């Protein structure tokens, strides 16, 4: 399944995945079914995250549209649950860990397990970990509640530790990096992992992306900027589009050099390319022509350019 004439990442394959999304979606089949049926997974911000009514009440001077944009999102239920002892983490340290770190441990391991690998198979191997990670809400929670800070707070809220913790727990000694390019962080992490495989820096890489919303700050800022939907719904490529809806998520996949695996593969990775918009209408606005060139570059790497 290698693309004819491909010169880049065409010898890489995906061998295992793990996912946890709103709507109690915990596997690829459930995700595909949700997409096929159009089931909605967005809704009002749950009280377990923050007091949305209080946040809206303190923002009424900003107008009805901004207040409505602040009310909605898509949230993972029971994101705080974690089997700490399975990963050799004490209850005290687990309590001080960003839920995003816990989810990365769970789904990084589950993706490797889905690839047929055990803890014994992984320890001491030069496998890579590449994590797309942008949200820093847990650190903000600690800032807002000084009494909750303790000996594990620094590592529990650190971005760099989020990727390093999986390598530490599983004994992985390959490249380990956290990539923050906002909403493209997961795709950028995939591109970096593919390049590492191509360069021989590792023969296997775990790619993860995670986002868990815990405080209202970013919600409010995006509502003010008009980025988020008034009705809490995404209408992509649709005349009804009026913004997007922020969401929790965690996903992981395992990429390997194709020659190192047998027939069990989910996807062949034919080509990747990573670029930046450069100058556009504003700092956060997309650049259509730059995105077109990015797609053309990835197709060329895959040997599939027309």
Residue map of PLM features:
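Condensing-enzyme catalytic core of the thiolase-fold
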Residues: 1-306
């Amino acid at each position: 399944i290698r693309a004819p004439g491909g010169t880049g990442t065409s010898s890489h394959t995906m061998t295992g995945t793990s996912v946890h999304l709103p709507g109690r979606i915990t596997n690829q089949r459930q995700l595909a079914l949700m997409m096929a049926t159009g089931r909605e997974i967005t809704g009002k911000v749950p009280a377990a995250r923050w007091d949305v009514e209080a946040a809206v009440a303190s923002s009424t001077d900003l107008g009805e549209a901004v207040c409505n944009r602040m009310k909605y999102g898509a949230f993972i239920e029971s994101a705080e649950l974690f089997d700490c002892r399975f990963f050799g983490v004490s209850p005290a340290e687990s309590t001080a860990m960003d839920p995003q770190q816990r989810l990365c441990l769970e789904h990084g391991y589950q993706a490797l397990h889905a690839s047929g690998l055990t803890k014994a198979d992984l320890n001491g191997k030069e496998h890579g970990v590449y994590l797309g990670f942008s949200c820093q809400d847990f650190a903000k929670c600690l800032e807002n509640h000084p009494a909750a800070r303790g000996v594990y707070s620094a590592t529990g809220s650190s971005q760099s530790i989020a990727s390093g913790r999986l390598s530490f727990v599983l004994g992985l000694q390959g490249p380990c990096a956290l990539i923050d390019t906002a909403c493209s962080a997961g795709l950028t992490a995939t591109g970096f992992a593919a390049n590492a495989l191509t360069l021989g820096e590792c023969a296997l890489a775990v790619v993860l992306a995670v986002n868990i919303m815990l405080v209202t700050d970013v919600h409010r800022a995006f509502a003010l900027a008009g980025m988020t939907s008034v009705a809490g719904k995404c209408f992509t490529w649709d005349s009804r589009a009026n913004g997007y809806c922020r969401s929790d998520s965690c996903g992981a996949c395992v990429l390997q050099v194709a020659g190192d695996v047998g027939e069990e593969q989910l996807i062949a990775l034919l080509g990747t390319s990573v670029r930046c918009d450069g100058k556009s209408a504003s700092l956060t606005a997309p650049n259509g022509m730059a995105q077109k060139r990015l797609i053309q570059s990835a197709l060329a790497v895959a040997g599939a350019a027309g």
